[in-house]
Amino acid sequence: MPFISGRCYNPFKRKGRKTRMNLDGLLVVDKSEGMTSLDVVREIKARFSIKKAGHIGTLDPFATGVLPVVINEATKLVPFLKDDPKHYEGVLKIGEETDTDDLTGKMIRKGSGEHLSPDMIRTIFKSFIGRIRQVPPMYSAVKVNGKPLYRMARMGIEVERKEREIEIFDLQIEKIAFPMVYFKISCSKGTYIRSLARDIGREIGCGAHLVSLRRTQSGPFTIEQAIPLSKVKALQSEEALRSCLIPLKEALFDLPEMIGDDSLVRKVRYGKEMVARDLDPDTLPPFEEKQWLKMSSPEDGLVAILQSAIRRGEIGAVGPDRVVFRPIRVFQNEKTVRKEESI
């Protein structure tokens, strides 16, 4: 086979111009087993020559399910996106504890759970519902003194980890086929299901670890929206990929929306604050002081994320030059991108 070049062929690259694909949005991927969350992002970036991308939340390599991926301008949304509750379906194995708290690790403890009745197991599961303290696994991305725990774990070093408060909103056993327990859980962000499996095993008295985990929801993003990575990579056009993306404005579904006219859009794009004289109170949604709002226009879509300096009800009582909104994120649209590329 003849050598062509060291660069990968990109079917979307257009000759004669610098390519900047207008692909901005959030893609809900159904992650397959065996990949890291970063692997998913890298493959999508490479397949479509995307400049910026990232993932919201992390799934362990053995876990599957909902992994929201933000693309290009959507990377600016991450601090403002709602990412809990998290919903999972999992399988826990009673009688063995591992050093990773899942099936990929080495067994460090073995016990017999034959004395356990289904009612005893259900009672122990229920005891974990509510606000609880949890110690992250050694094999995790949590940093201690600037170093990820998993790197120290691979060197055989175990360090003390600080407990974290998390919340289990619901924990239901679906089936018990001893030693396997099939369950569903709804929890806050930052919850380690592996740690939960370990702690349940210790409470039972004979150890346990996680053998299967599938995330079915992350914040507002559900498994019904998720697309397997293989199908994403099989898409043959920019338009096909774009049709799979959740638009920026829709991803911020829970933020109050302000519609801006051309003059306000222009002002915000230059990073300027909006004062009382700029605004018609009758067109504004309710908002409190220091609240985030999204600003959009019919032509441009999402323009910016704003932070309010006062409450909506105060606008009529303040002077005309009183600052009402400050832009904290400004988004490019197709027209502004084309203008930049022509400079």
Can you describe what each PLM-predicted range is?
Residues P2-F3, C8-S32, L38-L59, A63, ...:
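Accessory RNA 3′-end/elbow-binding domains used by RNA modification enzymes
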Residues Y9-I227, K231, I305:
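RNA pseudouridine synthases
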